[in-house]
Amino acid sequence: MATPTQRTPIQIVPHFSRLQEWIALDEGFFQDEGLEPMMLADVMHAVSSHHGDEYKRRPQDLPFVQQMEVVNSACQWGTACNAGAEMGKLVPDLYTVGRFAIFSRPGSKIQRLVDLRDVPIGIGERAGSHFTTLQVLEQILPKKHIRTVHTGGPGERLVALLRGEVEAANLLDPEIAIAEARGLRALARGEFLITFWVGPTIDKGVLKAYFRALKHANEVLSLTPEKYMHLWERNVPPALQDNYDYSAFGLGEKFVFEPYTEEMFQNALQFAEKWNLHTYIQDNTYDNLISVTGI
């Protein structure tokens, strides 16, 4: 194994809805690949806990606005739109599948999605919760009766729900498990694609090593999940820390080591355009916005 001075530094924003980055760190998989990981957990918690910052001022945007060489993830729509808005690039070699769920606040009379007609739903603007809420509700409600409110990150959305500040909100992992533990009612559940969102100047060899480490972490998580469930504690934002049964939190995002194709990319952009969420895009050419690693 290379010594710390021989390893290549890499700045990683752990994704709050999975464990693979933490497993790779604790098991030494990054180091085995010649990397010296800098885990930006403060950014992860800021993403989860922000109160509704504007686009390009959100915590997830700032590393890219500041031109840091960072590795992050976002929903497929977000990564595509962000890359098109000159914030990072999309890695097309793989993707993950995450969970979302729309919950109502404690004591709410809302029991079904149809009850959300003209009811503001807490989301993170131009992020996975926003796009998935629109996808779900457009199937049963006229567009003019779908309401969303930019409540902030997923941790902040659950805090707002528990305080009764919003009638309903879209949550991700680990907030889904926390909401369930606190007895909140789920109105809808689903899954969505998450893609890797990286600084445009990161060396391809460094990215390839990073993904090899994540693949190794994914393999050991699949083999002995019970060994790693305690790591969810690291992803719970400070405002929601408690003594949870982390064995009930599940495995988080599922990795799919298959290409995120141009067709998938264009479909994501078309959905964003349908809801007028494409307005920051300067370039929508797939080949210009991807960073191929060849894993």
Per-segment meaning from a language model:
Residues 273-295:
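Conserved C-terminal helix/tail region of periplasmic/extracytoplasmic solute-binding proteins
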Residues 2-143, 148, 186-189:
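Short, glycine-/small- and polar/acidic-enriched structural segments
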Residues 75-76, 173, 225, 260:
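Short secondary-structure boundary segments
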Residues 204-279:
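Secondary-structure end/capping motifs
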Residues 153-235:
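Pocket-lining segment of extracytoplasmic ligand-binding domains
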Residues 28, 164, 183, 276-279:
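Short glycine-centered helix-capping/turn motifs at secondary-structure transition points
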